[in-house]
Curated annotation (Swiss-Prot):
The keyword Repeat applies. This is Photosystem I assembly protein Ycf3. The lineage of its organism: Eukaryota, Viridiplantae, Streptophyta, Embryophyta, Tracheophyta. It is a peripheral membrane protein. Keywords: Chloroplast, Membrane, Photosynthesis, Plastid, Repeat, Thylakoid, TPR repeat. It is found in: Plastid, Chloroplast thylakoid membrane. It comes from Triticum aestivum (Wheat).
Length: 170
């Protein structure tokens, strides 16, 4: 039984019912429908902190999904799980792959910037200011891309860029 049918939350049940109705009436292939079901189940498992189950669902969705735009969101969510697990190198890889398919994902740029900023802070703690600056510069580049896509968002990043003189805003 798909995961989405067993969740007890009223909102999740309602969302699942609506999604199932849409899957029946929207003209899509059976493969696309299966991919969406795995994606939806992956999101549900991820929201509950069941990362291993979420990854299994996302990998199955990736196997079935052919649309690059839809694949970008699957890859992005896989990146989120690796970020949550502290697997930053893997997370960056998945964010890059998501952006290759959909360059308009500001949240992927933001998450990449956060990882780079974190690595910069870790380099400072290890006494390597040169490496730290390189990580901070990379974080700045990713934040600039995220901000360019959604200028009203990422206010903390904008403030950090101003304070560190890495970017001037108009």
């Amino acid at each position: 039984m798909p995961r989405s049918r067993v969740n007890g939350n009223f909102i999740d049940k309602t969302s699942s019912i609506v999604a199932n109705i849409l899957l029946r009436i929207i003209p899509t292939t059976s493969g696309e429908k299966k991919a969406f079901t795995y994606y939806r189940d992956g999101m549900l498992a991820q929201s509950e902190g069941n990362y291993a189950e979420a990854l299994q669902n996302y990998y199955e969705a990736m196997r079935l999904e052919i649309d690059p735009y839809d694949r970008s969101y699957i890859l992005y969510n896989i990146g989120l799980i690796h970020t949550s697990n502290g697997e930053h190198t893997k997370a960056l890889e998945y964010y890059f792959r998501a952006l290759e398919r959909n360059p308009f994902l500001p949240q992927a740029f933001n998450n990449m910037a956060v990882i780079c900023h974190y690595r910069g802070e870790q380099a400072i703690l290890q006494g390597d200011s040169e490496i730290a600056e390189a990580w901070f510069d990379q974080a700045a580049e990713y934040w600039k891309q995220a901000i360019a896509l959604t200028p009203g968002n990422y206010i903390e990043a904008q403030n950090w860029l101003k304070i560190t003189k890495r970017f001037e805003f108009e």
